[in-house]
Amino acid sequence: MASEENNDLENLLDIQLIEQKESLSSIDEALLSDPSNPELLSVHEELLSAIKEVEEGLLHLKRARLLEEADIVLNGLNHDAGVKPEHLEPEKTEEKKDLDGSKCRFRHTDGRWYNGRIIGFEGSDSAKISFLTPTSESMMICKFFMQQRCRFGSSCRSSHGLDVPISSLKNYEQTEWKQLMVGSKIWAVSGSKYDIWRKAELESWDDELQVGGVVFRDDKSSAKLGSDSLALSEYAQMTDDDGEEEEEEDEQQSASDSEDSVSSDYDEGSPQGIGFLESTNLPRGVQTDTALFAKWENHTRGIASKMMASMGYREGMGLGVSGQGILNPILVKVLPAKRSLDYALEHIRNGECKSEKQKKKRSRGGKRKRGKKFAEAAKAAKQEEESKPDLFSLINEQIFPTRHEKVHSESVKNRQNKGPVDRKALVEYQDEVRDLKLEMLKLEQMVNRNKKDLVVSEAATRRLKEVRKALASTLACQAAASNAIVSKENEKKWLKF
């Protein structure tokens, strides 16, 4: 155990020495720009003394290790036949010594394979592994643990290494970087190799120097890094030679075969589903040739189409595995206000009868009249299609009614053209004023609620101005009607005398 602890300490000191030398080089560069900075000079002196102490400690540890190995070799030479196990121990220690610090692949407790580095051994069958590409603080190896000075134990935020059986370790697969990989998303680390790895994008690659230019995605900074500081993924690359993968693939193939047989039996007995594509070798990426899947896409700006295309849907397909979903939006019938249901149903029937009578009309004429007839029919069909209110249109109409102003102006003009007003018209004005005040209150709340959303806020403000203008004109008409009624009643009183 003492030799293993010395090996761990030696590895840690090597890492610490590398980091201190890198820090010293950066301090030297800073001193070139500002040689009279007292803080930089003091840090430079402290780094030099720390590097000297670490080198002395490394020299002492290596000397002790070499003396121990020499004693083992001498003891093996002195004992010929009776001590075979002791003769084999140096071979095991040499093998472990060769493996110490080497890269490998190991399976984590989450079931994924990661790239790691052997930092020591726990007994004869277990190795202590650290993550080669740590992407979080919990994956980074604790420096104080390597120095046996960590006071937090199992509650430490950093990793104290993972105990993995030596038999389950796999050889490390080196990534072959090529020019074709430019533009791909990767993981990279800048500065020391023992920092946290970050997401980046490979911007360029030099095959001769084996150096790539990367752009980090978090802060948009760029750097030139070697292949040791780059990784295609935070997980380890798997090869076809892995026995466990072959077994998993066989199990998946057998499971997929059974699923195919079940699905074929299902297809024979039931209608074929159109929700998803059939199993094919064609790529199923984002469908760019289809902008709209259904009429309700007018309200989603094509975002839902892209999401559905990435899942394998095509235009005209119903939602669901067997295509049982609806294709058209839900129709909404807006009934006349302040009327009974009997009146509304009769009004709808009368409208349908009128449309049927219009369809039955025949006209005699030539090519010109037929063309005009077809154009009118197409225009009527388009208007009818647009006039069909769906759920989204109803919501938009309730929030931003576009025809409210026209209806209001027409109703005001009609009342003004009727001539003398009565109390019934005054009641209608009062109802309209109440509705406009309620709408104005809702719009004011909407403006206050959506101050951060510029588009909604501007639309609501514009509509609020229109409602205020309509309210002012309605109040003026109401006042005029009230004055007219009062003057008319006064005139009647005077006529009695």
From Swiss-Prot:
InterPro entries recorded: G_patch_dom (IPR000467), Znf-CCCH_4 (IPR041367), Znf_CCCH (IPR000571)
Biased composition (Basic and acidic residues): 373-387
PROSITE patterns registered for this protein in UniProt: G_PATCH (PS50174), ZF_C3H1 (PS50103)
Biased composition (Basic residues): 357-372
Start and end residues of each G-patch domain: 300-346
Region described as Disordered: spans on this chain: 236-281, 352-387
Alphabetically ordered keywords of this record: DNA-binding, Metal-binding, Zinc, Zinc-finger
Domain of life: Eukaryota
Pfam short name (any one): zf-CCCH_4
The keyword Isomerase is assigned to this record: no
Zinc finger (C3H1-type): 136-163
GO molecular function, one term: DNA binding
Keyword Ubl conjugation carried by entry: no
Biased composition (Acidic residues): 239-268
Family matches, as PANTHER family: ZINC FINGER CCCH DOMAIN-CONTAINING PROTEIN 22 (PTHR47650:SF2)
Designated name of the protein: Zinc finger CCCH domain-containing protein 22
